[in-house]
Swiss-Prot record:
Secretion signal, residue range per the UniProt entry: none
Keyword terms, alphabetized: Ribonucleoprotein, Ribosomal protein, RNA-binding, rRNA-binding
PANTHER family: 39S RIBOSOMAL PROTEIN L18, MITOCHONDRIAL, LARGE RIBOSOMAL SUBUNIT PROTEIN UL18M
A single GO BP: translation
Record family assignment: Belongs to the universal ribosomal protein uL18 family.
Gene Ontology MF term list: 5S rRNA binding; structural constituent of ribosome
GO cellular component, one term: cytosolic large ribosomal subunit
Ribosomal protein among keywords: yes
Protein name listed in UniProt: Large ribosomal subunit protein uL18
Role of this protein: This is one of the proteins that bind and probably mediate the attachment of the 5S RNA into the large ribosomal subunit, where it forms part of the central protuberance.
Organism, as annotated: Desulfosudis oleivorans (strain DSM 6200 / JCM 39069 / Hxd3)
Subunit structure: Part of the 50S ribosomal subunit; part of the 5S rRNA/L5/L18/L25 subcomplex. Contacts the 5S and 23S rRNAs.
Amino acid sequence: MGAANKKQELRLKRKARIRKKIAGTPERPRLSIFRSARHIYAQLIDDTKGVTFVTASSNEPDVKNNTELSGKNKSEVAVFVGKLIAGRAKDKGISSVVFDRGGFVYHGRVKAVSDGAREGGLNF
């Protein structure tokens, strides 16, 4: 087993531990974060029905074609993604969420998304 597989295996164990404790509801959906080497993804999920309300990522055209973000680092783009998902959540009438870091350390881009979402008006 390579080091990368071991690292991912440990992250998935952390993710499972976290998911045992938290769940999204229609009133307070789960803000789930996934971080890849290049992009960051966020979605609001109702776990009772298994429905995704809102998504935002650094891989979508709204973010990729934004001239303000050209030349920015990944953490600054993550803050924008957080603000984007907060704005989309407000449009759907969602103001309070449960934060799910997805097994990732609450640092760097994961923290940047949460900071952006809080700046955008989400409560968690």
